[in-house]
C-alpha cells in the first residue's frame, strides 16, 4: 500500500509545481501590461504638457510682439506730433519775425520821409514855399513813391505822369506847380552834391535817377559839375536785394562777377560787405601768410641772438670773477 501511494504523491507535487509556474507567469504578464500602460499614459501626459507649454510660449511671444508694435507706433506718433508742433512753432516764429521786419521797415521808411519833409523846411528859404500851403508840402513825400505807377502812354511819351504831380496840375495851380518844381530841384541839387561826395569816396559806378524830367529842362541846369560829363543811365526796374522799385539814388555794384543794381541803402551795405571780403582775402592771402611767416622767423632769430648775447655776457662775467678770485 505504501509503495503504491508514492507515485501519486509525486504526481501531485508535479501538478502543484505547474500551477505555481502558471501563476507566476500570469503575475509577470499582468505586471508587464500594467507598467507598459502606465508608461504610455505618462508619455501622453508629458506630450500634452509640452504642447500646452509651447502654446503658452507662443501666446506670450505674440502678446509681447503686439505690445512692442503698439509701443513703437505710439512713440512714432508722438514723435511725428512733436515734429509737427515744432515745425508749426518755427513757421509761426518765422511769420512773426517777417511781420516784425516788415513793420520795422515801414517804420524806418516813414521816419525817413518825415525827416525829409522836416529837412526841406531847413534847407529851402521860406520865401520859396509861397503857394505850397494847403497840404501840398506833403505831396513831396509821394513823388518818389509814385514813380513806379507813372504811365508811359501820352503824346509826349515823357515820364511826367506821377500821380502827385497830376493831382496838382489838375487843380490848375500854376504858382504852386512852379514852386513845387523849384523846391524839388533845389532838394535834388543838395542830394546830388552829397551823393557825389560818396561817389568820389569809393562808390563803385553808382548813378542817380531823380524821377521825372521837367519840360523846361530845369533838372539838367541843376546837375552838379561833377556829373555833367557822365551820360544819364536808365532807371533799374527794382533793387536786386530788397526788390524796391523806387529810389532817389541807384548803385551798380559787381557781385560774384555780375553787375547788379541796388538802391542807395542796399548799395552801401553791399559795398561795405565787398570791402570786408576784400580785406579778408588780402589778410588770408598766400603772400600775406608768407610775410607773416617771415616776420615770425625774423623775430625768432632776433630772440635767439639776444639769448646768445646774454649767455656770452654771463660767461664773460664768470671768467672775470674767476680771474679776480685767483
UniProtKB/Swiss-Prot annotation:
UniProt-listed InterPro entries: Znf_GATA, Znf_NHR/GATA
GO BP terms: regulation of DNA-templated transcription
Spans annotated as Disordered: 1-102, 145-238, 277-326
Superkingdom of this protein's organism: Eukaryota
Keywords for the protein's UniProt record, in alphabetical order: Metal-binding, Zinc, Zinc-finger
Polar residues compositional bias, start-end: 165-189
Molecular function (Gene Ontology), one example: sequence-specific DNA binding
Compositionally skewed regions (Acidic residues) per UniProt: 193-218, 294-326
Name this protein carries in UniProt: GATA zinc finger domain-containing protein 21
